[in-house]
């Protein structure tokens, strides 16, 4: 089939690679003139890694991934370790090591694998309509194209989603701002092989290793939306928000490069049931935009890619039937993880002070099993289990 994908993010690229593996002719159209990753890095948990392994990318993703052997929570104000444990039991349980990876490097790898010659930049879709067994897509430059299937991988502001649902879905602000970037690994920040998270006051500062001796860092602060966003003031702003925190966090803020640091107001969307309409189907954030609090946004987009490609391959009654079966497989799991991330977000960022304070106390008693079981419950249920 001739498949058009709108959006060249992780979901669109992974879907394109998967569909090409099954012999489809696939073209990706991206509205941006230049591909720029949203965020510095991503924690790619084992279910997402397995999806890339399935597509033959196991060596490539292993080269990009950091060596994350341990996990720790640290009191952000005192610097006291609350809990620290090995992730090896988790890795053995699910059968695959997780890989924190640079978003830019992951996106470049996926673009190379898909084929850059089939990615068209600066093409913004403005309208679509279905005609018999085809979909007509119109672009802002006046051009149009026909496809047998249209995959909407156009993110949290998806135009394709508006078409599928018949209405626009507004994003929900999650209540916190996230600053993220990359810094060199250094022992005065955190151990090199550990995901370390400093917590306190409903805020957090987190570091996880990616390839080439770098930490991916992020700092979260509960704030109202719409505040000033001036890169030149990032350091002094963060120093103000994290005043009185331990030396490791102060050192992180001092070392970050404001011009290479991203600031994101974190949002999600209310889960919905309809992932397709006729021959138009949604994947990734267009279908189930989530907060990053359980690290499953990119992983779920990759699961979508595998399920969609397989459903179109093995179900031969009709394209619509294959898309319906894709929806039935993906809807419950993806939407459940959106709500699970939302719940985790509220606890982490002190929506209820008593609940978050109780969580801090639980962390001091944690031996690792409870946290790992929670992560495992997010990982299992992927299409390759």
Swiss-Prot record:
Disruption phenotype: Cells lacking this gene are auxotrophic for urate. Growth defect can be complemented by introduction of XCC0279 from X.campestris or Mvan_5278 from M.vanbaalenii. InterPro entries: FAD-bd, FAD-dep_Monooxygenase_BioMet, FAD/NAD-bd_sf, HpxO. GO terms for biological process: purine nucleobase metabolic process; urate catabolic process. Its EC number is 1.14.13.113. Substrate binds at residues 178, 204, 216-218. The keyword Oxidoreductase applies. This is FAD-dependent urate hydroxylase. The keyword DNA-binding does not apply. PANTHER family: MONOOXYGENASE, PUTATIVE (AFU_ORTHOLOGUE AFUA_6G14510)-RELATED. It catalyses: urate + NADH + O2 + H(+) = 5-hydroxyisourate + NAD(+) + H2O. Keywords: FAD, Flavoprotein, Monooxygenase, NAD, Oxidoreductase, Purine metabolism. Catalyzes the hydroxylation of urate to 5-hydroxyisourate (HIU). Is involved in the urate degradation pathway to allantoin. FAD binds at residues 11, 30-31, 43, 125, 285, 295-299. The record marks 204 as: Involved in substrate activation for the transfer of oxygen from the flavin hydroperoxide. Homodimer. Its cofactor is FAD. GO terms for molecular function: FAD binding; FAD-dependent urate hydroxylase activity; NADH binding; NADPH binding; oxidoreductase activity, acting on paired donors, with incorporation or reduction of molecular oxygen, NAD(P)H as one donor, and incorporation of one atom of oxygen; urate oxidase activity. Belongs to the FAD-dependent urate hydroxylase family. Pathway: Purine metabolism; urate degradation.
């Amino acid at each position: 089939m001739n498949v058009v994908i709108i959006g060249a993010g992780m979901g669109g690229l992974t879907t394109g690679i998967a569909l090409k593996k099954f012999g489809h002719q696939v073209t990706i159209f991206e509205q941006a003139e230049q591909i720029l990753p949203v965020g510095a890095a991503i924690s790619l948990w084992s279910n997402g890694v397995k999806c890339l392994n399935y597509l033959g990318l196991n060596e490539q993703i292993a080269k990009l991934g950091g060596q994350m052997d341990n996990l720790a929570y640290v009191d952000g104000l005192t610097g006291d370790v609350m809990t620290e444990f090995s992730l090896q039991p988790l890795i053995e349980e699910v059968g695959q090591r997780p890989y924190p990876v640079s978003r830019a490097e992951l996106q470049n790898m996926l673009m190379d694998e898909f084929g850059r010659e089939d990615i068209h930049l600066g093409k913004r879709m403005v309208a679509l309509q279905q005609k018999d067994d085809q979909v007509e897509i119109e672009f802002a430059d006046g051009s149009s194209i026909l496809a047998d299937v249209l995959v909407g991988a156009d993110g949290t502001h998806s135009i394709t989603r508006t078409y599928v649902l018949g209405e626009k879905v507004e994003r929900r602000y999650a209540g916190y701002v996230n600053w993220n970037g990359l810094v060199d690994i250094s022992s005065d920040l955190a151990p090199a092989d550990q995901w370390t998270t400093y917590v306190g006051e409903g805020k957090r500062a987190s570091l996880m290793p990616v390839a080439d001796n770098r930490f991916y860092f992020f700092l979260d602060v509960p704030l109202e939306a719409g505040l000033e966003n001036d890169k030149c003031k990032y350091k002094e702003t963060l120093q103000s928000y994290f005043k009185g925190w331990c030396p490791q966090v102060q050192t992180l803020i001092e070392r970050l490069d404001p011009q290479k640091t991203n600031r994101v107001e974190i949002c999600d969307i209310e889960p919905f049931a309809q992932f397709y309409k006729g021959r138009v189907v949604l994947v990734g954030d267009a279908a189930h935009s989530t907060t990053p609090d359980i690290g499953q946004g990119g992983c779920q987009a990759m699961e979508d890619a595998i399920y969609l490609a397989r459903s179109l391959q093995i179900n031969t009654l009709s394209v619509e039937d294959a898309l319906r079966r894709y929806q039935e497989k993906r809807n419950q799991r993806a939407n459940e993880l959106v709500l699970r991330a939302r719940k985790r977000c509220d606890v982490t960022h002190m929506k209820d002070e008593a609940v978050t304070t109780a969580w801090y106390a639980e962390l001091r008693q944690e031996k690792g099993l409870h946290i790992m079981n929670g992560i495992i419950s997010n990982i299992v249920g992927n299409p390759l289990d």
